[in-house]
């Protein structure tokens, strides 16, 4: 298997895994604690030696690979809403990587959260609120806001809002890594078969 394509597909799976949780939260108001932790932990790995250092929860990653197959394959399971969120994340990622001040602020704020984890778990409400505020303060102001669809009763709850923003930050982290590994939007069209084949092979690892 092509190592670069494998790592790039891993990062793309990470984006979709976080986005799918956003969708589920917006509709149902609840999240799987292990999946949430897996996505949020990726934010904190800022100097990885490999993509595998970022995505250490294999069960969560496998869900991400299945989402890659659904979104890029010819199946009827392609989700237009997931695609819309993906387009929004990739657009914001481009703006972030062009903003030196934004990247510097992001690094500092993530370091603050890392220090907080000496006392709290990654899924603690205070930690999630801090991750959410990073997204609101730095990412959300870069461009058009991503409009989240869902159950209004769920979306009104502060903890749901915080989890959604924290997961969007996780999606951004994976998008940054995907781009660093050479990912381009045109690959999602012209290299679709190679990405699908890599995701299928990765599911067997």
From Swiss-Prot:
GO cellular component term of the entry, any: cytoplasm
InterPro entries in the record: HflD (IPR007451), HflD-like_sf (IPR035932)
Species of origin: Shewanella sp. (strain MR-7)
Name the UniProt record assigns to this protein: High frequency lysogenization protein HflD homolog
NCBIfam families found in the cross-reference section: PRK00218.1-2 (NF001246), PRK00218.1-4 (NF001248)
Gene that produces this protein: hflD
Keywords assigned: Cell inner membrane, Cell membrane, Cytoplasm, Membrane
Disulphide linkage map: none
Family as reported in the entry's similarity comment: Belongs to the HflD family.
Membrane topology: Peripheral membrane protein
Subcellular location: Cytoplasm; Cell inner membrane
């Amino acid at each position: 298997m092509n190592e670069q394509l494998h790592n790039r597909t891993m990062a793309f799976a990470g984006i979709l895994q976080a986005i799918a949780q956003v969708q589920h939260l917006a509709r149902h108001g609840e999240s799987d604690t292990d999946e949430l932790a897996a996505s949020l932990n990726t934010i904190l790995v800022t100097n990885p030696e490999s993509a595998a250092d970022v995505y250490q929860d294999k069960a969560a990653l496998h869900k991400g690979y299945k989402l890659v197959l659904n979104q890029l394959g010819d199946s009827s399971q392609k989700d237009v809403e997931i695609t819309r969120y993906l387009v929004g994340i990739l657009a914001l990622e481009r703006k972030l990587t062009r903003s030196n001040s934004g990247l510097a602020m992001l690094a500092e704020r993530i370091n603050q959260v890392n220090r907080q984890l000496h006392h709290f778990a990654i899924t603690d409400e205070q930690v999630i609120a801090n991750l959410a505020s990073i997204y609101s303060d730095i990412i959300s102001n870069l461009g058009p806001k991503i409009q989240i669809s869902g159950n209004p009763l769920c979306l009104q709850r502060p903890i749901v809002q915080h989890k959604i923003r924290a997961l969007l930050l996780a999606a951004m982290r994976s998008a940054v890594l995907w781009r660093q590994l050479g990912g381009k939007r045109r690959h999602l069209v012209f290299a679709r078969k190679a990405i699908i084949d890599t995701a299928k092979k990765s599911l067997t690892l």
